[in-house]
């Protein structure tokens, strides 16, 4: 993986419009083959979609799980992130750390290692996301189980999941 240095807030991934932060951007770069030295790549296992966003998507799709999945895939393909264009909201993800950029590995106080289970504490509306496959949609809890990847920027907040915590 290429190890370029990116902006700690992720502005290097903004495609449109230039000059804004990732949350305000319409489209961000979710190319997972291009990883920066101050980014964390995670294998994503589930998305917890913001309740207002999930409700809007579900209603627009008549509650049909296949259509809900297609709409989510479409949003991410178009925008590079899960940010509902109607509500503006995102959610958070759960996953496993797959790669840590070189600049972060030696950063004082950095406590992650590859293989750690984490939850993101920053919105999906600002997180580069690539979905390879939707495995299940849990309408009762606004959760979508996926196979995919996400990038956390140097400034991102996250929480490690304790080993004894149930999924």
Q: Could you tell me what each predicted segment is?
A:
Residues 20-22, 36-38, 91, 152-155:
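A short, polar/charged loop/turn motif at coil->beta-strand junctions and beta-hairpin connectors
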Residues 1-2, 11-13, 84, 142-148:
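Intrinsically disordered, low-complexity boundary segments flanking structured domains
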Residues 19-26, 50-54:
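Short N-terminal binding/cap micro-motifs at the start of the first secondary-structure element
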Residues 52-57, 129:
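Cytochrome P450 core scaffold surrounding the K-helix E-X-X-R motif
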Residues 33-48, 59-124:
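Glycine-rich beta-strand-centered segment in the early N-terminal region that forms part
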Residues 91, 117-167:
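NAD(P)H dinucleotide-binding glycine-rich loop of Rossmann-like/cofactor-binding domains
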Residues 2-24:
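OB/S1-fold single-stranded nucleic-acid-binding modules
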């Amino acid at each position: 993986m290429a190890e370029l240095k990116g902006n700690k807030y992720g502005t290097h991934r903004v495609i449109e419009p230039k000059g804004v932060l990732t949350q305000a951007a319409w489209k961000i770069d979710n190319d997972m083959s291009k990883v920066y030295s101050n980014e964390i790549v995670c294998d994503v296992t589930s998305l917890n979609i913001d309740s207002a966003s999930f409700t809007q998507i579900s209603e627009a799709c008549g509650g049909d799980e296949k259509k809900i999945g297609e709409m989510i895939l479409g949003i991410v393909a178009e925008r590079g992130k899960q940010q509902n264009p109607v509500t503006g909201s995102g959610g958070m993800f759960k996953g496993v750390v797959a790669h840590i950029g070189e600049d972060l590995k030696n950063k004082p106080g950095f406590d992650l290692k590859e293989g750690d289970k984490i939850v993101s504490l920053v919105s999906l509306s600002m997180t580069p996301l690539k979905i390879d496959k939707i495995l299940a949609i849990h309408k009762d809890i606004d959760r979508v189980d996926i196979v995919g990847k996400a990038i956390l920027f140097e400034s991102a907040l996250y929480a490690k999941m304790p080993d004894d915590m149930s999924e």
